[in-house]
């Protein structure tokens, strides 16, 4: 019994020593990395046509995929996120199966590029004369809060049928009010936690899964709040780089959705 206790104490002391060294060496090895060296995960809705369904263990339509870690989230249970920043863009794509899978061009929301497009009969895509098409794309930069309360950055892209969800979310965020010493004010976007779940949707073109958004309440952890604020500032400064992929790569979208 005494020997067992002694071994347990030795293991505990070793663990404490290792933890002390880890803390002392925090961040070492990452000195030469910047934003160009990291991949910002996309949180992507899986549909029946998503390549991961049938290829990745456990992947099912309606789930949410972290494109960097490969983590799958149950769409019914949802994920907890803190929205940190929002950028809308017009993205020019080559027709499916053509090009590199990367955007041909990314235009700011202030661009008049849509005035240079047209639509084909029975097709709601906005085509340029060169055959490429433009997608109105809403980018929601979020912190995903895991079960331990740890925040991790990610990007949710909403387009096509999900643009109305994006507008609804923006309105929800803008409607949050708090009372300060000078009266009512709108708190920063990254002050609130939201639960995102998925639900089946359809129209005469087909079926897919879409987002459902519910406000949970205010961020309670100061560490989480500061992490979200820092992420928001990085996005605002242009330091967060996004590598969109087209429908073939599926990195930027929510799977194939009817228009």
Predicted features, each with a name:
Residues 1-152, 203-204, 210, 218, ...:
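OB-fold ssDNA-binding interfaces and closely related basic DNA-contact patches used
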Residues 22-25, 49, 179, 234, ...:
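Surface-exposed polar/charged interaction patches
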Residues 42, 169-176, 224-235:
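Generic structural signal of hydrophobic/aromatic residues within well-ordered alpha-helices
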Residues 80, 162-165, 221-225:
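Intrinsic-disorder-associated interaction segments
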Residues 136-216:
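Extended serine/threonine-enriched, polar tracts that run as long, contiguous segments within proteins
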Residues 181-188, 192-193, 197-258:
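Accessory, usually C-terminal, subdomains that scaffold auxiliary metal cofactors
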């Amino acid at each position: 019994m005494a020997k067992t206790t002694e071994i347990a104490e030795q293991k505990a002391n070793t663990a404490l020593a290792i933890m002390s060294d880890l803390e002392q060496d925090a961040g070492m090895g990452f000195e030469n990395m910047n934003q160009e060296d990291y991949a910002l995960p996309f949180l992507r809705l899986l549909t029946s046509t998503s390549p991961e369904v049938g290829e990745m263990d456990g992947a099912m339509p309606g789930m949410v995929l972290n494109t960097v870690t490969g983590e799958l989230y149950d769409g019914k249970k949802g994920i907890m996120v803190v929205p940190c920043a929002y950028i809308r863009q017009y993205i020019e794509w080559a027709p499916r199966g053509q090009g590199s899978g990367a955007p041909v061009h990314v235009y700011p929301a202030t661009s008049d590029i849509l005035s240079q497009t047209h639509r084909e009969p029975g097709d709601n895509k906005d085509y340029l004369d060169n055959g490429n098409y433009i997608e109105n794309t809403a980018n929601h930069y979020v912190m995903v809060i895991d079960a331990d309360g740890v925040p991790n950055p990610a990007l949710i892209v909403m387009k096509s049928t999900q643009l109305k969800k994006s507008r609804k979310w923006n309105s929800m965020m803008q409607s949050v009010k708090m009372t300060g010493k000078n009266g009512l004010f709108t708190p920063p976007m990254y002050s609130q936690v939201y639960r995102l779940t998925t639900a089946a949707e359809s129209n005469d073109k087909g079926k897919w899964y879409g987002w459902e958004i519910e406000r949970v309440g205010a961020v309670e952890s100061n560490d989480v709040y500061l992490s979200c604020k820092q992420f928001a500032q990085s996005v605002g400064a242009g330091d967060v780089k996004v590598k969109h992929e087209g429908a073939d790569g599926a990195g930027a979208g929510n799977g194939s959705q009817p228009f």
